[in-house]
Amino acid sequence: MSSKGKILLVDDDLDFLDMHTAVLKNHGYEVFTATSGREGLERVRTEMPDAIILDLMMEKHDTGFLFSQKIKTDPLFKEIPILMVTSVAEATGYRFSLQDDGYWMKTDDFLDKPVKPEVLLERLDTLLKKRRDAR
């Protein structure tokens, strides 16, 4: 079976990584994982994923916010869609920008945790279709 696309999952929650890696692989995606923003940036450079699923808050002040800023301001990677997943958006007042306004977090879509696999797959398929159509 050929791959539907290369997906990078970045989250410090190993249970989240294991569960969603299995879901994505079962639906035809090639999956790479990283447990920190630093490791995620290395994986982006080596794997050139078609999309990134990114946790907002990780340990040791290693936030998805910083990761997304680095990706979306790099000419080589800025077109890679980012699907942000978080359990803190409502509680902390984080705002997500689906536009490049310079103030909000740069992401292409977001989901609240816990993430339902069918919703994750639907959103991911939509992001990948938009990216293909834009080429």
Predicted regions span which residues?
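Alpha4 helix (beta4-alpha4-beta5 surface) of REC/receiver domains from two-component response regulators
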Residues: 62-66, 88-111, 118, 122
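His-Asp phosphorelay/catalytic-motif detector in bacterial-type signaling
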Residues: 48-50, 76-81
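Non-catalytic signal-transmission and effector/linker regions of two-component phosphorelay proteins
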Residues: 1-6, 116-135
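Active-site beta3 strand of CheY-like receiver
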Residues: 47-54, 58
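Helix N-cap/capping motif at the beta->alpha junctions
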Residues: 33-42, 63-64
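Two-component/phosphorelay signaling modules centered on CheY-like receiver
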Residues: 14-32
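Short amphipathic alpha-helix used as the core "switch/output" element in two-component signaling
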Residues: 42, 65-78
